[in-house]
């Protein structure tokens, strides 16, 4: 059971952290640059600040298999964090988290079919996630980001976006496209796509150079 709460995007608030000016996209910024929130795009970039919450139930295998509720997904997770300030554009933080999750669960990386990216749309995050995914996965996955559509929720974004992806797959059988893409892209999706059968990889990042993969 997923319980979602999404609140209208907040505008006029700008986050400037990690020394990256204009890390988030505000209404004023959009008007000045003609850019719209998006990720992995050569024209549109950045994100609005959003609010939202999600409630999910996590159980061990023993209890999950006994529950009357239908099992939606199983997961294994790993995190890579340091005390450094800033995001490495070489993708090493994401790469360590991805490999940690793969090795912990003993998953064949070639069987990862869908990636829910952190997808803030900042230039540094685009470079970091692309680099990490290019060096760890095969070229047979599709990737999406929800932040251009719902904003960057503070704290709830990783779980909320993962649940939105699972719900979309359940309802439509497709991975949602990244909003405001300006070019055709079959990997970092410019249109809703039915994925091949396989695992889902969910990526997240936080302040203080913290990276998570599940």
Predicted regions and their residues:
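Conserved phosphate-binding/catalytic loops in two-lobed NTP-binding clefts
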Residues: 139-151
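Short glycine/threonine-rich loop-to-helix capping motif typified by GTGT followed
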Residues: 84-94, 121-137, 153-160, 191
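Conserved beta-strand-centric core segments of catalytic alpha/beta enzyme folds
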Residues: 1-63, 155-214
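Stable alpha-helical structural segments in soluble proteins, enriched in small hydrophobic residues
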Residues: 1, 97-105, 132, 136, ...
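Conserved beta-strand scaffold positions in the cores of enzyme catalytic domains, especially
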Residues: 74-75, 143, 200
């Amino acid at each position: 059971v997923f319980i979602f709460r999404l609140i209208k995007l907040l505008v006029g608030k700008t986050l400037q952290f990690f020394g990256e000016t204009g890390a988030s996209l505000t209404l004023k910024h959009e008007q000045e640059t003609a850019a719209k929130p998006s990720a992995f795009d050569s024209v549109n970039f950045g994100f609005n600040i959003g609010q939202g919450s999600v409630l999910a139930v996590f159980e061990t295998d023993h209890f999950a298999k006994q529950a009357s509720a239908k099992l939606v997904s199983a997961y294994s997770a790993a995190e890579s964090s340091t005390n450094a300030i800033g995001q490495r554009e070489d993708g090493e933080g994401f790469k360590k988290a991805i490999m940690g999750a793969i090795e912990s669960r003993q998953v064949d990386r070639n069987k990862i079919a869908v990636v829910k990216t952190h997808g803030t749309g900042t230039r540094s995050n685009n470079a970091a996630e692309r680099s990490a995914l290019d060096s760890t996965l095969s070229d047979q996955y599709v990737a999406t980001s929800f932040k251009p559509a719902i904003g960057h929720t503070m704290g709830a974004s990783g779980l909320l976006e993962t649940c939105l992806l699972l719900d979309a797959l359940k309802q439509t059988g497709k991975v949602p496209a990244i909003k405001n893409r300006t070019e055709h892209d079959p990997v970092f999706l410019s249109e809703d796509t039915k994925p091949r059968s396989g695992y889902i990889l969910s990526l997240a990042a936080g302040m203080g150079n913290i990276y998570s993969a599940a």
